[in-house]
Protein backbone atom coordinates (compact mmCIF):
# COMPACT_ATOMS: atom_id res chain seq x y z
CA UNK A 1 0.00 0.00 0.00
CA UNK A 2 0.93 3.62 -0.32
CA UNK A 3 2.14 5.47 2.74
CA UNK A 4 -0.30 8.41 2.76
CA UNK A 5 -1.81 10.46 5.56
CA UNK A 6 -5.35 10.68 4.18
CA UNK A 7 -6.73 9.15 7.39
CA UNK A 8 -5.24 12.03 9.40
CA UNK A 9 -6.48 14.75 7.06
CA UNK A 10 -9.98 13.62 6.09
CA UNK A 11 -13.23 12.39 7.57
CA UNK A 12 -14.81 9.40 5.86
CA UNK A 13 -16.96 8.82 3.92
CA UNK A 14 -16.33 11.80 1.66
CA UNK A 15 -16.34 12.80 -2.00
CA UNK A 16 -12.83 12.63 -3.42
CA UNK A 17 -11.81 13.84 -6.89
CA UNK A 18 -9.45 11.71 -8.96
CA UNK A 19 -7.83 13.14 -12.08
CA UNK A 20 -6.50 10.56 -14.50
CA UNK A 21 -4.21 11.78 -17.28
CA UNK A 22 -3.61 9.39 -20.13
CA UNK A 23 -3.05 8.97 -23.83
CA UNK A 24 -5.90 10.37 -25.92
CA UNK A 25 -7.94 7.26 -26.65
CA UNK A 26 -11.69 7.02 -27.07
CA UNK A 27 -11.99 4.29 -24.41
CA UNK A 28 -9.98 5.98 -21.64
CA UNK A 29 -13.05 7.41 -19.91
CA UNK A 30 -14.89 4.08 -20.05
CA UNK A 31 -11.88 2.27 -18.58
CA UNK A 32 -11.61 4.82 -15.75
CA UNK A 33 -15.32 4.46 -14.92
CA UNK A 34 -15.05 0.64 -15.05
CA UNK A 35 -12.24 0.64 -12.46
CA UNK A 36 -14.13 3.05 -10.21
CA UNK A 37 -17.34 0.99 -10.52
CA UNK A 38 -15.43 -2.10 -9.40
CA UNK A 39 -14.40 -0.43 -6.13
CA UNK A 40 -17.19 2.12 -5.58
CA UNK A 41 -20.36 1.31 -7.52
CA UNK A 42 -22.39 4.37 -8.46
CA UNK A 43 -23.62 6.68 -11.19
CA UNK A 44 -20.64 8.69 -12.46
CA UNK A 45 -20.41 11.61 -14.89
CA UNK A 46 -16.70 12.26 -15.35
CA UNK A 47 -15.45 15.38 -17.09
CA UNK A 48 -12.95 15.00 -19.91
CA UNK A 49 -10.56 17.61 -21.28
CA UNK A 50 -8.09 17.19 -24.13
CA UNK A 51 -4.58 18.61 -23.95
CA UNK A 52 -3.75 21.59 -26.16
CA UNK A 53 -2.20 19.34 -28.82
CA UNK A 54 -4.82 16.62 -28.36
CA UNK A 55 -2.27 13.99 -27.34
CA UNK A 56 -3.67 13.42 -23.85
CA UNK A 57 -7.00 13.34 -22.05
CA UNK A 58 -7.62 14.39 -18.48
CA UNK A 59 -10.53 12.53 -16.88
CA UNK A 60 -11.82 13.90 -13.57
CA UNK A 61 -14.20 11.77 -11.53
CA UNK A 62 -15.58 12.36 -8.01
CA UNK A 63 -15.88 9.20 -5.94
CA UNK A 64 -17.34 8.66 -2.48
CA UNK A 65 -14.51 6.98 -0.61
CA UNK A 66 -14.82 5.23 2.74
CA UNK A 67 -11.23 5.01 4.01
CA UNK A 68 -7.56 5.70 3.39
CA UNK A 69 -7.19 2.17 1.99
CA UNK A 70 -10.08 2.83 -0.40
CA UNK A 71 -8.31 5.92 -1.81
CA UNK A 72 -4.99 4.11 -2.10
CA UNK A 73 -6.60 1.14 -3.85
CA UNK A 74 -8.26 3.43 -6.38
CA UNK A 75 -5.00 5.31 -7.03
CA UNK A 76 -3.19 2.02 -7.64
CA UNK A 77 -5.89 0.50 -9.85
CA UNK A 78 -6.37 3.68 -11.90
CA UNK A 79 -2.60 3.96 -12.43
CA UNK A 80 -2.57 0.39 -13.80
CA UNK A 81 -4.92 1.25 -16.69
CA UNK A 82 -3.10 0.93 -20.01
CA UNK A 83 -2.12 4.34 -21.37
CA UNK A 84 -2.50 6.19 -18.06
CA UNK A 85 0.42 8.55 -17.38
CA UNK A 86 -0.60 10.09 -14.03
CA UNK A 87 -3.28 9.85 -11.37
CA UNK A 88 -3.71 13.00 -9.30
UniProtKB/Swiss-Prot annotation:
Stored InterPro entries: UPF0250_YbeD-like, YbeD-like_sf
Source superkingdom: Bacteria
Family matches, as Pfam families: DUF493
Alphabetized SUPFAM superfamilies for the sequence: YbeD/HP0495-like
GO CC terms, sorted: cytosol
Protein family according to the UniProt entry: Belongs to the UPF0250 family.
Protein name, as recorded: UPF0250 protein SO_1163
Organism: Shewanella oneidensis (strain ATCC 700550 / JCM 31522 / CIP 106686 / LMG 19005 / NCIMB 14063 / MR-1)
Lineage, broadest ranks: Bacteria, Pseudomonadati, Pseudomonadota, Gammaproteobacteria, Alteromonadales
Amino acid sequence: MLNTKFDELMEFPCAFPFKVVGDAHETLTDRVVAVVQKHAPGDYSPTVKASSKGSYYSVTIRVTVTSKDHIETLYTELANIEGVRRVL
